[in-house]
Amino acid sequence: GDINIESNSSLNSFSLPNYKKGEFTIGNNSSLTSVALPSYYSGLPTSTTYAQTITNNPLLTTIVLTSFNLGNITIKNNNLLATFNLPSFNNGSILLFSNTNLVNTSFPNFTDGVFELRDCNSIQQVNFPNLTTGRLQILYNSSLNSVTFPNLTNLKFGDNIGFYNNNLSSSMVNSILNKMLTVLPASGKNIRLDGQKPVAPPTGQGIIDKQTLISNGNNVQTD
């Protein structure tokens, strides 16, 4: 079944240890500090628009979704949330927006889907050790200096990949450009690495890799 927990100013914690499947919306709960759905394993099919949401809970520090493996989830405007892990998540979409104290994330089994990270200004790194097919949009995170996706082989949903307006170094920009040489499609990719603060143009081999990508019919923007 579906769950809607909204605008409950006296709710401090929410736990459903046996809840396994459905949509949930948890938002605008001014005293909520923890959400625990440890048995929840699947949202609706991944074609559904972001059915699982946890938004605008200003005191929330803990989210437990140990078994969640398939679906679409949005975590937004939870300003005390420092850690968000999905240890079982495999396929779907993860959107993390404006969680200003978020510093740690972990998605060790995420292999196929969409990931967006925006305006999370405390996080310094995000890693996707097993992502093979995906769309990454990682934008406007002022402390972010490292993004890794060693097993990515294919882009999806428009062939766009963006890492702009972060804090990536020239070395990290070089690394991403080199990786994109082998990510399919070979041509038609739109790659954005511009707007780093401070500016971080490609250097050395990175300049060569950028030109190779452009010569192969890709659009590449850097500082």
Q: Language-model segments: which ranges?
A:
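Canonical leucine-rich repeat
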Residues: 14, 35, 63, 83-84, ...
